[in-house]
Amino acid sequence: MATLRPELRELWQELCVELVLGQRGDLTGAAAGRRDRLHAERLAQLKSGSYTVAGPLALGATAVGGTPAVHRALHRYGIHAGVAFGLRDEVLGVWGDPAVTGKPAGDDLLTGKSTVLLSLAMDRLSSSAAEALQKTGCAAMTSLDVAVLQDALFTAGVNDDMEKLILRHVEDACLSLTDEALHPVGVAGLMDLTKTLAWRTS
């Protein structure tokens, strides 16, 4: 750290703060059983948008002396691409194949994490299924509860809602890459990265 240029050290420290804020929000949100969309979207932007994609891009742009226009374009791209990554993580956390993801089926339902997916579920599920949703994160939740809730969420269209959200953020990320300040070679690489982030299976 001591050998980093001051502006890079400052950016790194900002990333560390965002990391702590994101993890804190994750833990407190799960403990409080928060399901509101505002909290979930704020977490998605902090955890996935800021320090997973936008922050590292800012470090790279700063290291090579990128112009303010480059920084603005990369920040817009990073937030949208990062949120798309986070939303895909939420989909995989509910319906992902354990053999591919390496996590238990319905892992996010078992832990009761505060996610955009679960905030959407609050508006979509029937009263009986919504009762099952209240069990998320509780020790009393069984594998049968998880399976029932997975099916209820899918039937209610929550998966479709998530795919639309992911696509919207992918489109906004790609639109950010049309900025003339960005180099074509870098744009091509980021376009490929966007697809990997948004449509991965693990």
Which role fits each region the language model picked out?
Residues 1-202:
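All-alpha prenyltransferase/terpene-synthase fold signal
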